[in-house]
Structure formats: structure tokens, C-alpha cells
């Protein structure tokens, strides 16, 4: 029997209908389960400076002087004409649009001296002073990077990369912030520069640019407000620890019509790590991602691992994952603190290599030692992370080795999660460990596996969880810890239609009376 009927009436976009090539000029209104601001294309003063390339050597000076001059005049556009521009770190300034013409290529240096002096930044959730970013800004308003040009990072054979080999943010957290200076001098190493990473900025706009061969994370707004990222392309697969877009302790974000091909995570939410992140206490919140592509990479949409300040209110819809390891990836570790809540994902096509839904709160013994062991349940402290209110529905999954892989904490189970209206091809169905109120509804799979294993899962419910290959319902097997108030209901394998229900909408029973529910209803 075909699985096509399982998402009957709910249109899933194809890879040819999303991404930069489909970006319209206008910005469509944002409809989300939470309140979002109005997003409009920023308008800059009409003043323009056309940068002239130096005859020899680096072009850092003429580009930076043009940016500084334009900002002092009150703002405008700095145009980088076609050509290969060798440059060091560039610092964006208020009310300036750095526009890369088609055929323009900013090719960033791999030498430490071209990124000095050290600037304030955050590395893997820890504040410090180091090289910052290839394109950096601190405390600015109304900054933009636009155009059809390219931003190309340094090669991994460069001086910067070699001086980072022994560096870890774990080494700096015991120092006061003023002493966390890593500029490559006096035998100190450096922290890798991100590609585009404004910090403490308002009204950040990125459109149309291609990012290639990033040395580290690519687009990383930190402590920023009102961010619009549209129509960008990241090509960094096979080149370092290259996340695509990391929203780090920032809020009011719209990401649309993007394409990410990364070595690491693609669309990622972060907010600091451990005690350092708790001290800063700035969440990532109100993020909408739509009509975008994730190609290769560790995860399609990701929360973690650095979530000490919290991640809340994230909505992804009408996206395509084509080749990521995992589709929906939630990860942290016991001593990192923070939370993830109110995550909504719908209408996603995902062709993945490993898990479709992946949640890991234990981590690896390599990083946290015995804390990676599930038992004994630990005492709850401010550094105990928690996940709650995750809703994923109206999705089609192919190629995955495991449909669901949830390993939460016995002392802090993941709460109120919903996975429904799913059709999937998978080798294994998977497991859920340490969850409360975990619901799977109308999930139809093609698999030779027949069993979903659950452990310490209270108030779990499985409605219409069917295997088309075997022609029977998936068996729910309790292993290990007690699973109280388990609810399993089966439906016949017949074609049905579904109507998507957005969070906050009311369901009515057959007599027109409101009922409590979430996800979708059979019609």
C-alpha cells in the first residue's frame, strides 16, 4: 500500500520550490504560533561609495575606510565591484550596507595579524576576546551584507587554524572575562574567526550572498535583535567545523529562502554554555525559518548543545532537508544548563542518513565523563537542562536508519512532545527513554522493524502508529523503567484525509463542542 494518503491535503514543497532561486523581492507576512515583529527590507540613504582595489597586496584598508566614511556621513551603501579582494577582518558600521557585486569575491586572509586587535566575541557559548569574525560588528544598528558576490574563508592550512589546534573554551572559563584574551601573542593560541558574526547589534540584514569554505561557523548573530537572513547560500561541506546559521542568544529572527551545505549543523539555535551562559542569561527566542534547504550537515534544524540561556519559540515550516545526518536534532549535556521549549516544525521533507528525530541530553563520556551515564538520576541543579513542548508534524522522511532516538534525563524527562502525521521509510523504528507526555499520532512507516522501545515514559500515547510493510500496528515494548499511563490505539490501514491544526487553534468534537488537542484532526 502506498503511503501517499498519509499527508493527503497537506502540501509539502519540493527542493525545486524552496531556496535562493525562488526568493521573491517582497517579504511575505510572518504567521507563527507566537508574536513576531514586522519584517521589511531596510532602506539605506542614497549615498554610495565604490571601493577601488589596491594595485598590490591586501584590500582591507580601502574597504574599511569606505565603511567608516559612509557610517560617519550618516549611512549608505559601500559597493565592492567584481574581482578577487584579498582582505583581513572587516568591521561593519551602523547604517551601512556592504554590497558585494556579482563577480566580487572577498577572500579572507589566514594570518593572525590581519584580525588584530582581539575583539569581544563568544566561542561555543563562552565569552572571550579573540579574532572575532571575518565580517564583524559590535554595538551597531542597521547593518547589512547584500549582493550576489561571495565571501570565501581562509584555508585550513593557514596560520590561524594551526594556532587553534590546542584551544578549547573549556580552558578559559575559570578566568575572569578581562583575562580571556587570545590573540596569538606570548605563546597563546587563538579562537577561530566565524565568517559573519555581529554581536550586540540591532537590525541585521543579510541577503543574496554566497559563503564558501568557512573556517568555522558561518553566519552567527550573537546578542542581536531583529535579524533578517534571506536568499543566502553556504557551501562549506568538507571544510572544518562549519555550522551554517547559528542564532546565538538573539531574538526576532526571520530566515527564508536559504540553502546550507555544511560540515556540521545547518539551522541552529544556541544561547551560551554552563555557568558562563547562565550568567549572561540571554535566550534565543522568536525565530522563524521557512522555504529553505539543508543539504549535507549533521542536523537540519538543531537546538544545542549550548542552551544555558534558553531557546524558546522557534517555528520552521515549508523546508526541505536533502542529505543531512539527522533531521530534527536536540542536544545538550548535564552540566550545561538551560532549556528548549516551544519548538514547532511542520511541512518538511527530509531525506536523512541517520535519525529523523534525535534528542540526546546525555552526551559523550569523552566530554562529561561519568555524567554521560544515564543512571543514577542526578540531583537537579541550575545546570540541569530541560526540553519541553516540541511539536513536529506533517513531515515525510526517507532514507533514515532510525525514526526516533530519544535519550533524555531520568531526573528531567523531556515533556510534552508531539510527533505526528508522518510518513517515513526507516531501517529501525527506535527508542524513547525518559519522557513525559510524549505523543505519536498517525505515523505510518515502511520498515522491516516492528517494535518501538520505551523506557521510563509516563503518559505516552501512540495513536495510529502503523507499519505498511508488515500491514500491522507497531508494537510498543516497555523496557527497563516503569511507563505509567501508557495509551496505545490502532487505526485500520485505510486512506484518510488530514487537516493541519496550528498551535492555539480550537478543535471541535462531532457535536461542535471544544476539546483539548494538538497536532491535527481526521476529517
Question: What spans do the regions from the language model cover?
Answer:
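Generic long, charged, amphipathic alpha-helical segments
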Residues: 370-372, 376-396
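Active-site-proximal loop/turn and secondary-structure-junction residues that shape catalytic pockets
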Residues: 84, 233, 271-273, 305-307, ...
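Extracellular "leader-to-stem" segments immediately downstream of a signal peptide or signal-anchor
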Residues: 4-79, 84-88, 93-97, 101-200, ...
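Short glycine/acidic-rich loop motifs that flank beta-strands on beta-rich extracellular proteins
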Residues: 75, 87-89, 109-110, 131, ...
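Short, contiguous acidic/charged loop-to-helix segments that flank catalytic cores in large enzymes
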Residues: 304-307, 331-337, 375-384, 407-410, ...
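Hydrophobic core segments of beta-strands in well-ordered, beta-rich domains
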Residues: 522-523
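A beta-strand-loop signature enriched in Asp, Gly, Thr, and Trp
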Residues: 315-317, 322-379
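Right-handed parallel beta-helix
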Residues: 102-103, 141-150, 202-212, 225-236, ...
Amino acid at each position: 500500500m502506498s503511503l501517499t494518503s498519509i499527508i493527503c491535503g497537506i502540501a509539502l514543497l519540493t527542493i525545486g520550490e524552496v531556496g535562493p532561486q525562488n526568493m521573491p523581492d517582497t517579504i511575505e507576512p510572518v504567521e507563527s504560533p507566537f508574536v513576531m515583529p514586522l519584517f521589511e527590507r531596510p532602506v539605506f540613504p542614497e549615498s554610495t561609495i565604490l571601493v577601488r582595489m589596491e594595485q598590490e597586496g591586501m584590500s582591507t584598508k580601502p574597504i574599511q575606510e569606505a565603511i567608516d566614511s559612509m557610517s560617519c556621513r550618516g549611512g549608505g551603501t559601500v559597493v565592492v565591484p567584481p574581482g578577487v579582494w584579498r582582505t583581513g577582518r572587516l568591521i561593519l558600521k551602523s547604517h551601512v550596507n556592504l554590497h558585494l557585486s556579482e563577480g566580487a569575491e572577498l577572500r579572507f586572509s589566514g594570518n593572525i595579524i590581519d584580525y588584530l586587535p582581539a575583539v569581544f566575541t563568544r566561542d561555543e557559548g563562552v565569552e572571550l576576546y579573540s579574532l572575532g569574525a571575518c565580517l564583524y560588528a559590535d554595538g551597531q544598528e542597521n547593518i547589512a551584507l547584500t549582493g550576489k558576490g561571495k565571501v570565501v574563508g581562509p584555508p585550513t592550512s593557514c596560520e590561524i587554524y594551526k594556532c587553534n589546534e590546542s584551544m578549547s573554551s573549556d580552558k578559559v572559563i575559570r578566568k575572569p572575562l578581562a583575562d580571556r584574551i587570545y590573540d596569538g601573542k606570548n605563546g597563546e593560541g587563538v579562537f577561530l574567526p566565524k565568517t559573519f558574526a555581529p554581536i550586540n547589534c540591532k537590525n541585521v540584514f543579510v541577503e543574496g550572498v554566497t559563503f564558501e569554505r568557512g573556517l568555522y561557523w558561518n553566519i552567527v548573530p550573537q546578542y542581536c535583535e531583529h535579524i533578517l537572513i534571506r536568499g543566502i547560500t553556504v557551501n562549506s561541506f568538507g571544510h572544518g567545523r562549519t555550522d551554517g546559521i547559528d542564532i546565538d542568544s538573539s531574538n526576532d529572527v526571520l530566515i527564508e529562502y536559504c540553502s546550507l551545505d555544511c560540515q556540521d549543523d545547518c539551522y541552529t539555535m544556541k544561547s551560551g554554555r554552563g555557568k558562563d551562559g547562565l550568567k549572561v542569561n540571554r535566550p534565543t527566542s522568536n525565530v522563524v525559518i521557512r522555504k529553505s534547504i539543508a543539504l549535507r550537515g549533521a542536523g537540519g534544524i538543531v537546538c544545542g548543545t549550548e542552551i544555558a540561556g534558553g531557546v524558546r519559540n522557534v517555528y520552521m515550516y515549508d523546508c526541505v532537508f536533502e542529505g543531512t545526518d539527522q533531521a530534527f536534532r536536540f542536544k545538550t549535556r548535564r552540566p550545561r544548563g538551560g532549556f528548549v521549549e516551544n519548538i514547532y516544525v511542520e511541512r518538511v521533507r527530509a531525506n536523512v542518513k541517520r535519525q529523523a528525530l534525535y534528542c540526546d541530553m546525555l552526551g559523550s563520556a569523552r566530554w562529561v565523563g561519568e555524567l554521560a551515564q544515564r543512571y543514577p538520576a542526578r540531583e537537579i541543579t541550575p545546570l540541569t537542562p530541560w526540553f519541553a513542548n516540541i511539536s513536529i508534524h506533517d513531515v515525510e522522511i526517507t532514507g533514515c536508519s532510525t525514526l526516533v532516538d530519544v535519550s533524555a534525563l531520568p531526573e528531567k524527562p523531556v515533556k510534552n512532545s508531539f510527533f505526528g502525521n508522518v510518513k517515513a521509510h526507516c531501517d529501525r523504528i527506535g527508542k524513547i527513554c525518559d519522557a513525559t507526555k510524549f505523543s505519536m499520532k498517525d505515523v505510518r512507516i515502511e520498515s522491516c522493524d516492528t517494535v518501538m522501545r520505551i523506557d521510563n515514559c509516563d503518559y505516552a500515547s501512540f495513536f495510529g502508529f502503523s507499519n505498511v510493510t508488515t500491514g500491522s500496528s507497531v508494537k510498543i515494548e516497555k523496557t527497563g523503567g516503569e511507563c505509567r499511563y501508557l495509551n496505545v490505539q490502532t487505526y485500520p490501514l485505510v486512506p484518510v484525509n488530514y487537516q493541519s491544526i496550528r498551535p492555539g487553534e480550537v478543535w471541535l468534537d462531532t457535536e461542535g463542542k471544544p476539546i483539548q488537542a494538538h497536532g491535527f484532526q481526521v476529517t
